[in-house]
Amino acid sequence: MKIVFVNGSPKGNNCISQKIIDRLIPYCKGHQYGILSVNEDMDRNMALQIMNMADGIVIVSPVYAGGIPSVLLGFLSDLEMHMSEKKARVSAIVHGDLFDSDDCLNALSIVEAWTSHTGLAFCNGLGIGGSDQFMVSDAGFDNRHLKEGMADIMRSIIQGVSLASRCVSPGNRMLYRRNMETLHHAKMEENGVEPDTWNVRIARLFRSSSAVKKDTENENVSESDEQKS
């Protein structure tokens, strides 16, 4: 079986989409596979030939504003018009920074609709929320639900079974929300806006305490230097 992984991220190889593809490759044991990175400079004719040869297509893409990147959308539109072979099975993984799954579900529906219009078979979809953590640490890939979802993506392609799409969020919802609030509220304060919630007050208190501690440490260092001199 020939499997093509489509990296739909405009960021190329140094991105979360590629990290996800790297973890799907071990499932291809005994099968041929290739990776197609979608970008403005790609050879569209060559890409079309590759897609026509595929028995299975796995699209991996970030979610931008509730949809998929324009460069990927344009490429899929070209395939819809010019793809001659209609044999491939298609599955998709979309990932977004937001913890909740609404944007991921919308992006998956775009890929599923394209598959139907092109005359291909859509097998399975997986949405991953809060995926920005993967740029900091790979620990999120150890999440049981994420592992099961990725295994289902490859099983649906290889075995030709249709599975219900799902969305997962590898991190902790409360911790993710708290971190995002702290980050965005700090930026708001830098711009002269003062949000007033209990979380903001607590974060402000911790930042003030840290600043006082740092000033005290600097004063102690200065006094020590003066005594030595």
List where the protein language model places each region.
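Charge-dense, low-complexity intrinsically disordered segments
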Residues: 11, 15, 62, 66, ...
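N-terminal beta1-alpha1-beta2 submodule of the flavodoxin-like/Rossmannoid cofactor-binding fold
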Residues: 1-86, 117, 158, 162-229
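Active-site oxyanion/phosphate-handling segment shared across diverse enzymes
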Residues: 127, 132-175
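Amphipathic alpha-helical segments in well-structured domains
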Residues: 21, 72, 76, 108-111, ...
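A short, terminal or domain-edge coil/loop segment
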Residues: 87-98, 140-153, 174-193
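Short, glycine-/small-residue-rich phosphate/pyrophosphate-handling segment
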Residues: 89-145
